[in-house]
Design a protein with these regions (language model features):
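Short N-terminal binding/cap micro-motifs at the start of the first secondary-structure element
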Residues: 12-15, 39-40
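NAD(P)H dinucleotide-binding glycine-rich loop of Rossmann-like/cofactor-binding domains
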Residues: 90-145
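Conserved hydrophobic/aromatic beta-strand scaffold that supports enzyme active sites
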Residues: 15-17, 64-66, 82, 104-106, ...
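Glycine-rich beta-strand-centered segment in the early N-terminal region that forms part
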Residues: 21-36, 48-99, 111
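Conserved hydrophobic "DFG−1" position in protein kinase catalytic cores
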Residues: 6, 20, 44, 106-107
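Short structural boundary motif marking the start of a folded domain
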Residues: 1-5
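Residue-level signal for short segments within beta-strands and strand-turn junctions
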Residues: 6-8, 46, 67
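Cytochrome P450 core scaffold surrounding the K-helix E-X-X-R motif
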Residues: 40-46
């Protein structure tokens, strides 16, 4: 289990227990260390983001974390790597609006999937998969934003 900051339709927030995400063979488990609010998050909190109706939700598509475990086919991430984490999935308990305000997330290794012959139909080239990148260890987790 893990904790995540959940936003409810009426705009209030609460810290909730939820399932820790399970990683697949092309994914890595990342422990979140920092997250940032953006204008999209604010619009979701105040329920004014056009077309968004998926409450309760875990906010955050601007996060930083460290890899804690990797799937068997991951080639481009290793335990201990520092990662920029946009567009995350926080598990099954709450609809995720990217999920950086939860303790853990999974990221995909799109490059390894492509090397192994996976295609767009397999979800390889989604914006989220392509945006998840390693950053230098010496970068401060908060200053990255």
């Amino acid at each position: 289990m893990m904790k995540g900051l959940v936003i409810w339709k009426d705009g209030h927030a609460s810290l909730e227990e939820m399932k820790k995400p399970e990683m697949g063979e092309y994914q890595a488990l990342v422990r979140e260390t920092a997250g940032a609010l953006c204008g999209t998050d604010k619009e979701i909190i105040y329920d004014v983001l056009k077309g968004f109706h998926n409450y309760p939700t875990v906010l955050g598509h601007e996060g930083v974390g460290r890899v804690e475990a990797v799937g068997s086919k991951v080639k481009n991430f290793a335990v201990g790597d520092k990662i920029v984490l946009p567009f995350l999935d926080d598990g099954e308990d709450f609809y995720s609006t990217w999920g950086a305000f939860a303790e853990y997330a999974v990221i995909g290794d799109a490059e390894a999937m492509m090397e192994d012959g996976h295609t767009v139909g397999d979800g390889v080239l989604t914006e989220g998969n392509m945006a998840q990148k390693k950053i230098p260890q010496e970068f401060d987790d908060v200053e990255v934003f």
